[in-house]
């Protein structure tokens, strides 16, 4: 997990890694995960060019669209669907197969999950949409607090080991 201050350098490193993996140079390296906590706070994504995207946004877009095939995965948390759509181009949701939502407006729920269920949820509940969209499978669960740094480090260590 990285914060907004380290975003630019990390995204540059991952874009370079993606290019190496696409060319076959780094194909055997282990999977890489980039956790973006609060994409709405990434100022570098706000000042868009004439096409509606910053240079950092273009690189993140490429990682989101092509990275999973080459073992580079994004975990993105955003406070609103609109903030996520500002950070990336329209259609970015197609790059995210697994989605989690707390209570949302009916429109955002339909756009994110393909169902209005998240608009009718109680507090302290969340929905998880699986990558198998055809099945329509959605799981309801109780989210809890973000784990402390020690727990996150243990999880990251396990992920690195494979």
Model-flagged regions — what are they?
Residues 105, 109-162:
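Conserved P-loop NTPase
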């Amino acid at each position: 997990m990285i914060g907004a201050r380290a975003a630019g350098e990390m995204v540059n490193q991952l874009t370079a890694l993606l290019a190496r993996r696409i060319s076959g140079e780094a194909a055997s390296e282990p999977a890489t995960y980039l956790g973006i906590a609060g994409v709405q706070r990434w100022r570098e994504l706000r000042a868009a060019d004439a096409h509606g995207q910053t240079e950092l946004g273009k690189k993140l877009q490429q990682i989101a669209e092509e990275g999973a095939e080459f073992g580079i995965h994004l975990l993105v948390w955003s406070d609103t669907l609109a903030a996520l759509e500002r950070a990336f181009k329209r259609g970015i949701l197609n790059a995210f197969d697994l989605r989690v939502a707390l209570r949302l407006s009916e429109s955002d729920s339909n756009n994110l999950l393909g169902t209005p269920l998240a608009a009718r949820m109680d507090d302290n509940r969340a929905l998880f949409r699986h990558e198998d969209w055809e099945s329509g499978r959605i799981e309801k669960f109780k989210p809890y607090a973000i784990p402390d740094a020690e727990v996150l480090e243990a999880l990251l260590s396990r992920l690195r080991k494979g």
